[in-house]
Amino acid sequence: MSSSIIGRCHFVADSIEAAGTKRRTTRWRSPRAAVIPSFHLPMRSNEVKNRTFADDIKALRLITAIKTPYLPDGRFDLEAYDTLVNLQIENGAEGVIVGGTTGEGQLMSWDEHIMLIGHTVNCFGGSIKVIGNTGSNSTREAIHATEQGFAVGMHAALHINPYYGKTSLEGLISHFESVLPMGPTIIYNVPSRTGQDIPPRVIQTMAKSPNLAGVKECVGNDRVEQYTSDGVVVWSGNDDECHVSRWDYGATGVISVTSNLVPGLMRELMFGGKNPALNSKLMPLMEWLFHEPNPIALNTALAQLGVVRPVFRLPYVPLTKAKREEFVKIVKEIGRENFIGERDVQILDDNDFILVGRY
């Protein structure tokens, strides 16, 4: 048996002897070398595959919070995942968030998480910036995951503030100071999920580090304007506000959910100058995507477009049939040609979906 690299993904060639002849078959195998057998490896932040500077991250205008698709048994569907990432590259996205909220990092083991970051780097790291979500409400876990993420080659880390077991402002500063020295970092402020706002004082303190690439900000455009006036790079974390954030409040771009579905249109929204007509055209889709907590609607939409299997890791479940029917209408209004995939959009029945509780 021998191995080879095709498109930077791992393939294995088997030699098979039959009736005195020898033939070779090639089959794809997931990059097991990237799987960390023990989470607590003695890696250090200087042991990295790629060395990226914060300025390289600061320039990105369209970053997609990429979806993680699944096989019927709940394991990662890497073939579908690779298709999703390739479609982002082909349609002009400059970066992907791996294992974020949209990618359901909260439903992954750390072994899965680091493997997926490493796989994305190995297959696509030369074509798109790979930003690994290695944040945690435990500083200890955030340190270990970030060390390992940089060790397998991610270009930057995404860090949320500690949630549920909230800490003081001094605790927030200490938490972020523990991970910032490792490499380029985006701090993610989403109080609706964490229960705690990261105030500007904390970000201003973190901005003293050369590794702070910027902030993914979900509080609103007043906060975006405050940071941009202070010279802090900001990405809008709200798709429905990103056009105004970009062109009226100085945001560098967006870290987007909607771009999973219409990456080309989202690129146009971020690169092409003010375009209120396009923004209005996309607004029904954006509102539909966030009718229920993300990523429920996105998972449903990608399944209806036929680009991922209709498999959900619980506790996420698909949208109601009425909302699935509404999505078909939205696709027709925007134009099927603007969405990823080649199949006609479908209205899936309830029994088409697979819900996996053990994964």
From Swiss-Prot:
Pathways involved: Amino-acid biosynthesis; L-lysine biosynthesis via DAP pathway; (S)-tetrahydrodipicolinate from L-aspartate: step 3/4
Chain sites annotated for binding pyruvate: 102, 255
Catalytic activity: L-aspartate 4-semialdehyde + pyruvate = (2S,4S)-4-hydroxy-2,3,4,5-tetrahydrodipicolinate + H2O + H(+)
Keywords linked to the UniProt accession: Amino-acid biosynthesis, Chloroplast, Diaminopimelate biosynthesis, Lyase, Lysine biosynthesis, Plastid, Schiff base, Transit peptide
Record's subcellular location: Plastid, Chloroplast
E.C. numbers: 4.3.3.7
Keyword Plastid: yes
Gene Ontology MF terms: 4-hydroxy-tetrahydrodipicolinate synthase activity
Residue ranges that the Swiss-Prot or TrEMBL entry lists as coiled coil: none
Cited InterPro entries: Aldolase_TIM (IPR013785), DapA (IPR005263), DapA-like (IPR002220), Schiff_base-form_aldolases_AS (IPR020625), Schiff_base-form_aldolases_CS (IPR020624)
Transit peptide, UniProt annotation: 1-33
Domain of life: Eukaryota
One GO biological process term: lysine biosynthetic process via diaminopimelate
Any one of the GO CC terms: chloroplast
Active site as annotated: 188 (proton donor/acceptor), 216 (schiff-base intermediate with substrate)
Predominant place of localization: plastid
Protein family membership: Belongs to the DapA family.
Function field: Catalyzes the condensation of (S)-aspartate-beta-semialdehyde [(S)-ASA] and pyruvate to 4-hydroxy-tetrahydrodipicolinate (HTPA).
Xref: NCBIfam families: dapA
Protein name: 4-hydroxy-tetrahydrodipicolinate synthase, chloroplastic
Organism: Nicotiana tabacum
